[in-house]
Curated annotation (Swiss-Prot):
Family according to the record: Belongs to the pyridoxine kinase family. PdxY subfamily.
Molecular function terms from GO: ATP binding; magnesium ion binding; pyridoxal kinase activity
Species in which this protein is naturally found: Pseudomonas savastanoi pv. phaseolicola (strain 1448A / Race 6)
Subunit text: Homodimer.
The EC number(s) this enzyme carries: 2.7.1.35
Binding site for substrate: 12, 47-48, 225
Pathway: Cofactor metabolism; pyridoxal 5'-phosphate salvage; pyridoxal 5'-phosphate from pyridoxal: step 1/1
Cofactor dependence: Mg(2+)
Protein name per UniProt: Pyridoxal kinase PdxY
Entry keyword annotation includes Nuclease: no
Superkingdom in the source lineage: Bacteria
PANTHER family: PYRIDOXAL KINASE
Length: 288
């Protein structure tokens, strides 16, 4: 019997709705990954609503919880770490301490850093120290980085002028340490208005993927968290990078189709669960 992979997901959590771990955990489980959720914040709902309440996990609790897993002899079974939204650079450094501990227990363990800073339509939502930490420290340890366009712009200190420029910016991030960079949402002058575009960049090659852009009265939150989680999960399940990239684009599109059909603001993950596991659509990544 094939072993089920285990993934430590260090992200935010909302009681109502879907963002951070609340957007990623169930889909990752649904496609066959054992997820260990470590919630960096617990909020009533995501912060695009007019109000929310909740608490942030103290940074020192992150390595302490990981040591608790080590104490019961399970840390070596962790195949990957996924990190998302950071409340502070201190929280980020605590995560890197945990990643180092896990890689010591399992040298084959992977680390995907989703450098959450915001959304092109919503602006930056983190302090400058977090952006600096992600670029200067997290990128060096990450196997994979999955920025959106705003985050890639922040790392580059400029906006792109073309698709080729986006590719150059992703390659500059790749040079800081990751094995692969996935740009989850491209935005550049001349991009087709009816398309949603992504990039996958490695040292050897690059791929571009386009799918239809779906319209919503309010853009659902958690799409990036879902994207990063599914991409890492498919790699753990044996996909190569391009196959994981294509599967992720299709599965996320299926969720958005279901969400749109329901007229929902929150992602319809439960209703779309079979479409996540077995996407009906397929989008081909084109090598650049």
């Amino acid at each position: 019997m094939k072993r089920t992979p285990h993934l430590l997901a260090i992200q935010s959590h909302v009681v109502f709705g879907h963002a951070g771990n609340s957007a990623a955990v169930f889909p990752m489980q649904r496609i066959g990954v054992n997820v260990w959720p470590l919630n960096t914040v617990q909020f009533s709902n995501h912060t695009q609503y007019k109000q929310w309440t909740g608490e942030v996990l103290a940074p020192q609790q992150i390595p302490a919880l990981i040591e608790g897993i080590a104490a019961i002899g399970e840390l070596g079974n962790c195949d990957a770490v996924l990190s998302g939204y950071l409340g502070s650079a201190a929280q980020g450094r605590a995560i890197l301490t945990g990643v180092a501990r896990i890689k010591a227990a399992n040298p084959k363990a992977l680390y995907l850093c989703d450098p959450v800073m915001g959304h092109p339509e919503k602006g930056c939502i983190v302090a400058p120290e977090v952006s600096d930490f992600l670029l200067q420290e997290a990128a060096a340890m990450a196997d994979f980085m999955c920025p959106n366009q705003l985050e890639l712009d922040s790392f580059s200190g400029r906006k792109p002028e073309s698709l080729a420029d986006c590719l150059a910016m992703a390659r500059a991030l790749l040079a800081r340490g990751p094995k692969a960079v996935v740009v989850k949402h491209l935005d550049y002058p001349g991009k087709a208005a009816d398309g949603f575009e992504m990039l996958l960049v490695t040292a050897e090659a690059s791929w571009h993927l386009r799918r239809p852009l779906l319209a919503f009265p309010r853009q659902p939150v958690g799409v990036g968290d879902l994207t990063s989680g599914l991409f890492l999960s498919r790699i753990l399940l044996g996909d190569d990078l391009v196959a994981a990239f294509e599967f992720t684009a299709a599965a996320v599109h299926e969720v958005l189709l279901e969400t749109q059909a329901c007229g929902s603001y929150e992602l319809e993950l439960v209703r779309a669960q079979d479409r996540i596991a077995h996407p009906r659509v397929k989008f081909d990544a084109v090598r650049l």
